[in-house]
A protein has these predicted regions:
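Active-site microenvironment for binding and transforming phosphate-containing groups
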Residues: 1-309
Length: 309
């Protein structure tokens, strides 16, 4: 049973999963290592109502907190983690990345956060689930299967122009001795270039940031009717791919999304598509407490219409 998402191409980047009645996405590139539980939520399978329906994961968009609590419980059951072990970002479009310890467990879900301005999280603690939020911005997920370190970062246009993906990789190197050549990196569901119009000042920031870098020819383009207004179409997927490659991530270890949030309003939240009337999607990433290469998933997950075993 497939969720029904529209894809930009035929590449197999994601597996569509349903567990405990909750649809979500997984990356085969991460799953095959047998080291993590992970998933990216859709807007389906929760209890929130109206434009927040139904799997809203934000406590700050006017939802009933009891609904959000239940949504977290459902996501936790679906991907195999515990709400009290989740740790959430406090996203303000920075490039600040926090090292998460066992003492942080539950922050943002079962207890208050004691930090602000954090758009990325890194941990090497098994059982701690990193949670980041999106509704057009770019999810970035990382796994070093050698050092057994995971990271999750939020990269909107501000984070992207300021190299959020690269900053995260550098933090993994500095704090945990990770080698970029070993790191698996995933660029998640977010708004595609076709749907993402930006102003000339944003375009200029990207032109400056990527000046002299190869592979940027299609990063920005203008439709004929946009020239008078100084508007451009920006490719956040390519921008993040370029930063990650520049950080040392190898092509065979990098997966770039082919799912656009704005093209899938029935299944994913999109800020642009709904003029801000939306909930938040979540990306969940957790080192297994007994993770070993090649370990199997729990029963009950359906993968693109076929039972995993």
């Amino acid at each position: 049973m497939k969720i029904g998402l529209k894809y930009k191409n035929e590449e197999h980047i994601f597996d569509e999963c349903i567990s405990a009645g909750v649809p979500f996405l997984k990356y085969p590139i991460l799953e095959k290592e047998g080291l993590v539980e992970h998933g990216i939520s859709t807007r389906l399978g929760g209890v929130s109502e109206g434009f927040l329906g139904s799997m809203n994961l934000s406590y700050t968009r006017g939802d009933d907190p009891a609904h959000v609590d239940e949504n977290y419980r459902r996501m936790a059951a679906a991907i195999g983690v515990k709400p009290e072990h989740m740790v959430c970002t406090h996203q303000t479009h920075t490039t600040n990345v926090r090292i998460v310890t066992r003492e942080d467990a539950g922050k943002g879900v079962t207890r208050e956060k004691d930090y602000t301005d954090v758009d990325g999280l890194i941990t090497n603690v098994p059982g701690i689930c990193l949670v980041t939020f999106y509704a057009d911005c770019v999810p970035l997920l990382f796994l070093d299967p050698v050092k057994k370190v995971v990271a999750s970062s939020h990269s909107g246009w501000r984070g992207t122009v300021n190299r959020m993906g690269q900053v995260t990789v550098e933090k993994m190197q500095k704090e945990f001795g990770c080698d970029p050549k070993n790191i698996l990196a995933c660029v998640g569901p977010s708004i595609c270039q076709e749907c993402y119009e930006v102003s000339s000042d944003v375009a200029e920031e990207f032109q400056k940031a990527f000046a002299g870098m190869n592979g940027t020819e299609t990063l920005l383009y203008q439709k004929p009717e946009q020239k008078a207004e100084g508007k451009y179409q920006l490719d956040l997927w390519l921008a993040n791919q370029l930063w990650l490659t520049d950080a040392g991530i190898t092509p065979e270890h990098l997966e770039v999304t082919n799912v656009c949030t704005a093209h899938n309003p029935a299944y994913l939240f999109s800020h642009r598509k709904t003029n801000g009337k939306r909930g938040n999607l979540g990306a969940f990433l957790c080192l297994k407490e007994n993770g070993t290469a090649g370990s199997r998933q729990r029963n009950g997950i359906v993968w693109q219409g076929k039972s995993r075993w």
